[in-house]
């Protein structure tokens, strides 16, 4: 891996081997006005072909109504994902490269094209709220999320999240078809809460 600076930009170059597959990567960071744009491109040599993956994001921070706010917008392309919205069980099962990466915890999505957006609003110095949206461009389903982080007291923190999957049955976030009538594999709205004490 090579990390460097040049022309007021930061860059990384990577040559690696992962699970017997050669990988080439390049990434960079540059300032655009008062915002920051980051991007990474990875080429993976599988048994059959070179597969491309790409992520580009834009981030910006500002003060809104007296509160510190930071926002991020991101495009994610994963060449191992399934094309468009064909998430039938036989298509998923036949995608060995995708399934292997999901099982190893390298990927968490089925499709190829995604948009993401997030904001972090500092309501008070001890309370942050972050609305997030993860949108699958192939099947028009999404996951909406609101995260709350509250530093309750010295060494105490409360973390909470509300998750809302959006989309019709047969989509990634609306629920995948199982091949059985009226039975989809998905999740409904969810609520998570955690109280942590650090010592």
Placement of each model-derived feature along the sequence:
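Outer-membrane beta-barrel "beta-signal"
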Residues: 162-164, 182-199
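Residues that define the transmembrane beta-barrel architecture of outer-membrane proteins
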Residues: 5-7, 20-24, 50-54, 67, ...
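Extracellular/periplasmic loop regions
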Residues: 36-122, 171-183
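C-terminal hydrophobic structural anchor segments
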Residues: 110-159
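Repeated loop/turn-to-beta-strand initiation elements of outer-membrane beta-barrel proteins
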Residues: 6-12, 34-38, 65-70, 125-130, ...
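Transmembrane beta-strands of outer-membrane beta-barrel pores
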Residues: 6-8, 15-19, 32-34, 43-47, ...
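Residues on the lipid-exposed face of transmembrane beta-strands in outer-membrane beta-barrel proteins
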Residues: 2-4, 26-30, 39, 56-60, ...
């Amino acid at each position: 891996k090579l990390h460097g600076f040049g022309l007021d930009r930061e860059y990384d170059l990577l040559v690696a081997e992962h699970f017997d597959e050669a990988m080439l990567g390049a990434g960079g960071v540059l300032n655009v006005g008062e915002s920051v744009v980051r991007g990474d491109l990875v080429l993976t040599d599988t048994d059959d072909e070179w597969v491309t993956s790409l992520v580009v994001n834009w981030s910006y921070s500002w003060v809104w109504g007296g509160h510190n706010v930071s926002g991020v917008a991101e495009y994610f392309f994963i060449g191992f994902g399934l094309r468009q919205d064909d998430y039938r069980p036989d298509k998923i099962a036949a995608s060995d490269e995708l399934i292997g990466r999901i099982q190893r915890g390298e990927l968490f999505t089925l499709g190829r094209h995604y948009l993401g957006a997030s904001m972090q609003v500092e309501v008070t110095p001890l309370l942050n709220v972050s609305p997030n949206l993860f949108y699958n461009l192939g099947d028009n389903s999404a996951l909406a999320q609101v995260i709350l982080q509250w530093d309750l007291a010295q060494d105490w923190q409360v973390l909470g999240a509300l998750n809302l999957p959006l989309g019709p049955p047969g989509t990634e976030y609306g629920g995948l078809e199982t091949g059985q009538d009226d039975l989809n594999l998905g999740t409904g709205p969810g609520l998570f809460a955690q109280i942590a004490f650090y010592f």
